[in-house]
């Protein structure tokens, strides 16, 4: 992760005393996603039963580890992840900018991934079993800040069970996030849009056809029609200052209602199709 706190030398000093401690390192910085992918590949190739991601930034409480592990070890889930938002105190502990960005991305990730029961999509405190390790194509996983979001989409296509686990949000007092919220939200939103379309194609067309793709498609078409028709309404009203043709107003409202209903039904069908993956 391109850390500058002598992490490598510290790990090497301890690995000489403990043969179970294995250090994996990159010659070039590959981002957080690249580091996680390398670790997962090593775990897969060495027949590890459960692989856990715990960052070295002291923001993941080790006391939460048993709770993260239990669902995977007991066979209740293929992938478990921490959720800092379960706590009613989360908004007080998490930096405001990060909390706001996380909330937006969590909503978008629900839609893109099909895991409607999960939240706190940006947490990296996770556990994954050997079945999922062997099925996921780690070479295709996103390598940057959107890695957790991308992985959830890939797991959904593979019908892996995912469980959210309450964890304690750990942040230093007065800590300020270095994340540029506008860049992160737009870049990951674009990633989620692409992965959402990929999931619809892969899961509901190629692997097993589901009519919800028609509902999403019609919702999209009526959405475009809504924009065009309302633009014409505002053109008559604001630019020309004339009366709005009643047929135009009715068509705009019809398109808006149709787009909303088709999209909401598509989401509902998606939720029903994935409810067994909790």
Language model segments and positions:
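Short, conserved SAM-binding/catalytic segment
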Residues: 14-18
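Hydrophobic helical membrane-anchoring modules
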Residues: 140-278
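Acceptor/aglycone-binding surface of glycosyltransferases and processive sugar-polymer synthases
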Residues: 21-45, 50, 62-145, 171-186
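A conserved acidic beta->alpha catalytic loop
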Residues: 1-9
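Short beta-to-alpha linker loops that shape the active-site pocket of alpha/beta-hydrolase fold enzymes
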Residues: 2, 85, 168
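Acidic metal-phosphate-binding loop of nucleotide-sugar-dependent transferases
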Residues: 4, 30, 58-59
């Amino acid at each position: 992760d391109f850390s500058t706190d002598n992490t490598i030398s510290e790990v090497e000093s301890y690995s000489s005393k403990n043969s179970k401690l294995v250090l994996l390192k990159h010659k070039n910085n590959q981002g957080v996603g690249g580091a996680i992918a390398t670790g997962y590949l090593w775990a897969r190739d060495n027949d590890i039963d459960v692989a856990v991601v715990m960052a070295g930034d002291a923001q993941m409480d080790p006391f939460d580890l048993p709770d993260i592990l239990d669902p995977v070890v007991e066979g209740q889930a293929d992938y478990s992840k921490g959720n800092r938002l379960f706590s009613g105190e989360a908004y007080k502990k998490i930096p405001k900018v990060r909390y706001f960005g996380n909330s937006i991305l969590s909503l978008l990730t629900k839609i893109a991934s099909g895991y409607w029961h999960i939240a706190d999509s940006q947490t990296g405190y996770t556990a994954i079993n050997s079945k999922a390790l062997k099925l996921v194509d780690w070479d295709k996983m996103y390598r940057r800040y959107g890695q957790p979001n991308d992985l959830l989409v890939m797991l959904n296509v593979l019908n892996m069970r995912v469980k959210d686990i309450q964890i304690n949000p750990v942040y230093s007092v007065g800590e300020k996030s270095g994340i540029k919220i506008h860049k992160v939200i737009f870049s990951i939103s674009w990633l989620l849009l692409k992965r959402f379309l990929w999931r619809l194609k892969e899961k509901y067309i190629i692997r097993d056809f589901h009519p919800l793709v028609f509902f999403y498609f019609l919702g999209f078409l009526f959405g475009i029609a809504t924009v065009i028709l309302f633009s014409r309404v505002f053109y008559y009203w604001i630019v020309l200052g004339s009366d709005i043709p009643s047929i135009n107003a009715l068509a705009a409202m019809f398109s808006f209602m149709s787009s909303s209903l088709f999209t909401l039904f598509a989401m509902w069908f998606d939720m029903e199709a994935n409810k067994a993956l909790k």
